[in-house]
Amino acid sequence: MGRFKQHKIVIENTLFLSIIEFVNMLVPILALPYVIKTIGKDNYGLVIFAQSIIAYIIIIINFGLNISAVKLVSENRHDKIRISQIVSSVVCTKFILWLIVTLLYAICIVIIPSMRNCWELYSIVFIATLFEIIFPQWYYQGVERMKYITLIRLISVAFYLSTLFVFVRTKDDFLYVPLLQSIGAVLSGIFGLMMLLFVEKVKYVLPSVGLIKKTFSDGIPFFFSQLSKTINENIAVTMAGILLGMGDAAILGVSKRIITFAATPGEMLCNALYPRNSFNKDRIYFRGFLKFIFLAVVIEVVIAFYLIPYVVEFFAGDTMPDAVMVTRFYLLYLMFVPIVTYVGYSGLIAFGHAKAFNTSIYISVFVQLLLYLLFFATDYFNMYAFVAANTLSMLSMLIYRMVYCRKYKLV
């Protein structure tokens, strides 16, 4: 009966996470044909290039706390006093980091010509960073109440969709795209914080300096791993925007968004299993889901291969003919992502091997940067090279994690 209850909780949490992630990604994707047609491919490329820069900044604000805090909340879920201390110290630490980053970001806008010329865009996309402070997803994930995450994220999606077609009418309205996304994120974050305080009854207490330092130090290993992961995920769009132009950045952005959407079910299952495996540390349970994820991913990749031309045509029309081949080239990356995520979080971290988890990400970044150095040395720059670098770095991470899962007798 206990085993059935565990499976029931995981299934429910996976369902809630999958619903919101599908809605959260499906709505912008459904709006993508309208956005590209209205603001143009180059303006869309400029927007996602700016957002790729913000992705690095968000990692600094989170500082690995979105991982370390999930484990702490999960392990102390029945201790209200300890939970209040954890929540307060995490929010306070993030706010301090946000203040520092805001100052540095403002300086960059002033001194870097390309950012100064588009200061409105870079200022608008930065608004979204507030969401990382006020929305305690790590708490809801730790206590396994994914339905709250679903409800809160729906607010952001609903706001964006309901306002997009009202405010974005011409090419000159491209700034409204990131603005509406940012406002929706902040509104949903505020709602999530209110639920934490008034529904979950978590009290905010002023954390001591020592507790903030401890929270900060707990996040350090995960910060570097998350920074490395973000480099892996965003470097293709960033480099395309710098070296190839905003049109190619737009193509890579659309292709990556399609692949990310396809990877959502596996990612959500992994997110739902992580707190459960952290709590139980059941090797048989871990191995069973690993086999299931592998089989599901193989089936998904085969189906995706045949559907990609229709999906690209729906999203981008005939404005991005190269996106079909680029997206198909990304399929190996799609195959690796859920497995890498599962063995990393539910395997290495959940069973107390965070060092191996972090090292695997450092190695993947090293592989990717090495490939980019090779591209520079040979003057070989194109979208397929960037996708190949992404995929090979993910493969190196998978190999390393599986070796250590084998070493620790997890598989």
Q: What kind of region is each of these model predictions?
A:
Residues 1-10, 147-150, 174-181, 190-233, ...:
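Interhelical loop/hinge segments that connect adjacent transmembrane helices in multipass membrane
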Residues 9-66, 220-246, 300-301, 369, ...:
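Signature of the first transmembrane helix
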Residues 12-24, 50, 55, 59-109, ...:
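Membrane-water interface segments that mark the loop-to-transmembrane alpha-helix transition
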Residues 41, 108-125, 307-338, 352, ...:
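Interfacial segments at transmembrane-helix termini and the short loops linking adjacent helices
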Residues 51-59, 229, 252-271, 300, ...:
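Transmembrane helix-bundle signature of multi-pass secondary active exporters and lipid flippases
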Residues 62-78, 259-281, 344-350:
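Helix-loop junctions and terminal segments of transmembrane helices
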Residues 119, 129-151, 270, 275-279, ...:
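Membrane-interface junctions at transmembrane-helix termini in multi-pass inner-membrane proteins
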Residues 126, 150-200, 256, 363-367, ...:
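Hydrophobic alpha-helical transmembrane segments
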